[in-house]
UniProtKB/Swiss-Prot annotation:
NCBIfam families: leuS_arch, PRK12300.1. GO terms for cellular component: cytoplasm. ATP binds at residue 632. A motif ('HIGH' region) lies at residues 42-52. It comes from Methanothrix thermoacetophila (strain DSM 6194 / JCM 14653 / NBRC 101360 / PT). It catalyses: tRNA(Leu) + L-leucine + ATP = L-leucyl-tRNA(Leu) + AMP + diphosphate. SUPFAM superfamilies: Anticodon-binding domain of a subclass of class I aminoacyl-tRNA synthetases (SSF47323), Nucleotidylyl transferase (SSF52374), ValRS/IleRS/LeuRS editing domain (SSF50677). This is Leucine--tRNA ligase.
Length: 950
């Protein structure tokens, strides 16, 4: 029997122990249909947080669901440790960096005495691997832990070497010069996992246009080189001391920050002097494209860290330039030697766009009512003009031979021409700043020479990846367009570094394989990891071993002779791989769409035959905490361990899974979690009460409320099943938990009891993927074996009773109507009289449904038919008025109500209504009521009885 009190932690620890001892989630090949599901392995530089909780729990719920469908489910887990972050973290801990110590003691809850031990990468990996595993066990994930590994394991290193050998053979790994995100401190390229801040920043190729100031160059960075034809002035921040630098064979004037960035490019750069920005103000520069002489004006808004620190102004097409220039019209600039009237600066219109007149920037500012350059709406105006000009704009005659060219096509054409003329260069810059490495250093864009790259830009490779994507299920489907867009734009990526943890390039051992590049096909390694963990020899894992295991090349005997692994083991591993692969579902957070999930597809396409390509990807959103974005390096943060400690595993699972759907972001709120705990306790109490009841007669004839409840139960099975098939955990729980709670409340309120055990048996199985511990505890008292292995409920179509559902809906609505009248009138009823619809109104509704077409009711046709009906003819004075009412609501009319025996339903349930309201209830037909002191019977309509209360 269930205990009186729900003790979450005790129940959860009990079942976690039993599952592990009995190997309930161990998966081996057999005759069943297989389901291989994977989620991203966590990076071992901190404790698991609520973002992990959401992604991992979705994966576990789906794994449990498919297991109950009777499928053979493999749900494994491993740990990611390669790259530089862990090395950098160990150094910061060893140096007792105060920020790091605060983050890891306060946010991650690591005792100082433990943190003191984490001064080597190996210690950090070992500590967080154990913590992550404990956390995942504490929440009840149904993982086959025999297959775990860490990406620094020797066997995994051999696996990655094999993968990169194939990539190189196919020409996908090359050496060259490319712009990369670079950490000056670590002297390494950085990828998303290496970045502390600015992880969404991409590398943009700006055009540096070389304006001339005597014999010097004033380079201006722009994403829209076509606007050079409309430049009226340059902007310089007078408060910044600029550097004079020799860049190749030219002398440039740039901000100090720009100079720093230039030193990481493939240019020869040397500082030769300085010049205060204020000394540049008032001077005249020359536009290298148009030859126009333009004035340099002061602008404190110019960010020296953006571009070159010098900005070209195009007030006709850039709202911020227009506003800044307008703000200077009445300013005293005499200290810069500027005495001319800036109002005389003529705007230059160079783009024709349908939505605007000659000067789009001016029109947009006026349209949005932008006050000045500090108005937040100025940015909105800028984006609006840019978007409209990009999509609909065409260059005007002033641009010469480029006239008539659409704006969205001009950049590459013009850029190449300007480079050929020697008046422009490409300058790579981050899309957002700053970008901070996990070591704390500020990253730059560096042009790296002799760097190993993965050629993701290869057109043949791209086309194959798109082919793979086309054959996959993407959940939600609207994410497919984002995948296609990311694949189209994906460029070559640095795949090796010189520092950190990881696998060395087999042909160039000075380089370590980058941490995103080594985490692409690791799902295949889960098949092998079980044998490695069981003690298989790994010192001679040559490429031919992996060729056979994963590609079927060679023979078991050949592989055995090369590796020392016995023939039977080699053959079994190959058979296991053939059984389990490909991956049936990869579920992940949406932040990995732009990197890991793309590389996952790319590398599977490159390594494996089409039959082994992934079958489905599901993507979910982020998690915030009390409305704030979480950060494991800055806070706030809710660790998985903390969530389970405070709420219990099942409450944590239920709350996070019901919080949001698909790519919607979830918001963890502690009061919401507490409310969920109360609902889980209610579930437990209901189950205990049902188990303990001794007044249940399962052989009794089904009553109306029994038929209704069993019908609703079938619908809940159908809804929950459909939702889980579509990875919609929120919708699944709305049906399986919240709607079921409401259904049971109504069932018991109506006196239902004989089907409670039958209902509980189904309900517990519906809830098992979401709240497995409490469901195992209940199932132990009502079922056989483990609910985790119990068959998923199958709906019985013969129990779907629409008549019973309509009858109960009618009764419930009638009860609500009575309650509303009592509430409004503040009456304590002594007597309630109900009048069901008269026959003539039922017939009128029937005719209205027959003559209505396309949602419209022809009153003439209705009345013509009605007057030929004897029941209606006797009410010919009232019929037109009721017909008019029907005409207004024809779009909502349904024939279902005509199937209701309203008088019979209310008469049979008169006793129930009397008990509900504590007074006698009488039921009459409105056709001939024996008691109607206020004439209420005339108000009765189909589906809505008239109500009289004394």
């Amino acid at each position: 029997m269930l205990r009186n009190e729900y003790s979450a932690h005790e129940i959860e620890a009990k079942w976690q122990r039993i599952w592990e001892e009995e190997g309930v989630f161990h998966a081996e090949p057999d005759s069943r249909k297989k389901f291989f599901l994977t989620i991203p392995y966590p990076y071992l530089n901190g404790n698991l947080h609520a973002g992990h909780t959401r992604t991992f729990t979705i994966g576990d719920a789906i794994a449990r669901y498919h297991r109950m469908l009777g499928e053979n489910v493999l749900f494994p887990m491993a740990f990611h440790a390669t790259g530089t972050p862990i090395v950098g973290l160990s150094e910061l801990i060893a140096n007792r960096d105060p920020l790091i110590w605060d983050v890891y003691t306060r946010l991650h809850g690591i005792p100082e005495e433990e943190l003191e031990k984490l001064t080597t990468p190996e210690a950090i990996v070992d500590y967080f691997r154990k913590q992550a595993k404990l956390a995942m066990r504490s929440i009840g994930y149904s993982i086959d832990w025999r297959r775990e590994f860490t990406t620094t394991d020797p066997a995994y290193n051999r696996f990655i070497e094999w993968q990169f050998g194939i990539l190189r053979e196919k020409g996908y790994v090359t050496k060259g010069s490319h712009p990369v995100r670079w950490c000056p401190n670590d002297q390494n390229p950085v990828e998303d996992h290496d970045i502390l801040r600015g992880e969404d920043a991409t590398i943009l190729d700006f055009t540096l246009i070389k304006f001339r100031l005597d014999d010097k160059v004033l380079p201006c960075a722009t994403l829209r080189p076509e606007t050079v034809f409309g430049v009226t002035n340059l902007w310089v921040n007078p408060n910044v001391v600029h550097y004079i630098a020799r860049v190749n064979d030219e002398v440039w004037i740039v901000s100090p920050q720009a100079y720093h960035k230039l030193t990481f490019t493939d240019r020869s750069v040397k500082k030769i002097g300085e010049i205060p920005g204020e000394e540049l103000i008032g001077k005249k520069a020359r536009n290298p494209v148009t030859g126009d002489e333009i004035i340099i004006l002061p602008a404190t808004f110019v960010d020296p860290d953006s571009g070159s620190g010098i900005v070209m102004s195009v007030p006709a097409h850039a709202p911020l330039d227009y506003l800044a220039l307008r703000d200077l019209y009445d300013a005293d600039l005499s200290k810069y030697g500027i005495t001319e009237d800036l109002r005389k600066i003529k705007f230059i219109s160079l783009i024709s766009v349908p939505e605007y007149g000659e000067f789009p920037a001016v029109d947009a500012v006026n349209e949005l009512g932008v006050k000045d350059q500090n108005d937040p709406k100025a940015e909105e105006a800028t984006k609006l003009v840019y978007r409209r000009e990009f999509h609909n704009g065409v260059l005007k005659e002033i641009t010469g031979r480029y006239a008539g060219t659409p704006v969205h096509r001009i950049k590459d054409i013009l850029l190449q021409d300007l480079i050929n003329q020697g008046v422009a260069e490409i300058f790579y810059e981050f899309s957002e700043t700053p970008v901070i490495c996990r070591c704390g250093a500020r990253c730059v864009v560096k042009m790296v020479r002799d760097q190993w790259f993965l050629e993701y830009s290869d057109p043949v490779w791209k086309s194959r990846v798109l082919e793979c994507l086309a054959g996959m299920q993407i959940i939600p489907e609207e994410m497919r367009a984002e995948f296609i867009n990311k694949i189209d734009w994906l460029k070559d990526k640095a795949c090796a570094r010189r520092k950190g943890l990881g696998t060395r390039l087999p042909w160039d051992r000075e380089w370590l394989i980058e941490s995103l590049a080594d985490s692409t096909i690791y799902m295949a390694f889960y098949i092998l990891a079980k044998y490695v963990n069981a003690g298989m020899k790994i010192d001679r894992l040559v490429p031919q071993f992996f060729d056979y295991i994963f590609l079927g090349k060679g023979t078991p005997e050949e592989v055995s002779s090369l590796t020392g692994v016995d023939v039977d083991t080699v053959r079994r591993i190959r058979e296991d791989f053939e059984y389990w692969y490909p991956v049936d579902l990869r579920t992940s957070g949406k932040d990995l769409v732009a990197n890991h999930l793309l590389f996952f597809l790319y590398h599977h396409v490159a390594i494996f035959p089409e039959s082994l390509w992934p079958r489905a990807i599901a993507v979910n959103g982020f998690v915030s905490l009390e409305g704030q974005k979480m950060s494991k390096s800055r806070g706030p943060i809710l660790t998985l361990k903390q969530a389970v400690a405070e709420n219990g595993a099942d409450v944590t699972r239920l709350y996070i899974l019901a919080n949001a759907e698909y790519t919607q972001d979830a918001d963890w709120r502690n009061d919401g979690a507490q409310a969920t705990r109360g609902q889980v306790e209610r579930f437990y109490t209901l189950a205990r009460e049902i188990i303990e009841r001794n007044d249940i007669d399962e052989s009794a004839e089904l009553t109306l409320i029994d038929r209704w409840m069993l019908s609703r139960l079938q619908r809940r099975i159908i809804e929950t099943t459909d939702a889980l098939n579509n990875i919609q955990t929120r919708r699944a729980l709305q049906s399986a938990f919240y709607h079921m709670l409401n259904d049971l409340r109504w069932y018991e309120r109506r006196g239902g009891r004989n089907q409670l055990r039958r209902i509980l048996n189904v309900w517990v199985r519906l809830m098992a993927p979401f709240t497995p511990h409490i469901c195992e505890e209940i199932w132990q008292n009502i079922g056989e074996g483990y609910v985790s292995r119990a068959p998923w409920p199958v709906p019985d179509a013969s129990l779907i009773d629409e008549q019973a559902e309509r009858a109960e809906a009618y009764l419930e609505q009638t009860q609500k109507d009575i309650e509303e009248i009592i509430r409004v009138t503040k009456t304590k009823p002594r007597r309630i009289v109900l009048y069901t619809t008269p026959v003539w109104k039922r017939e009128m509704l029937r005719l209205a449904l027959e003559v209505s077409k396309g949602g419209r009711l022809d009153m003439g046709a209705l009345m013509k038919s009605a007057m030929g009906h004897p029941e209606i003819q006797s009410h010919k004075k009232d019929a037109p008025k009721y017909g008019g009412k029907l005409a207004k609501s024809v779009h909502a009319l349904s024939g279902d109500v005509l199937a209701l025996d309203e008088l019979g339903i209310l008469s049979r349930e008169r006793e129930y209504l009397s008990q509900a309201f504590g007074c006698p209830v009488e039921v009459y037909s409105a056709d001939n009521p024996p008691y109607d002191p206020k004439g209420r019977a005339q108000n009765a309509e189909p589906g809505r009885p008239a109500i009289y209360i004394e």
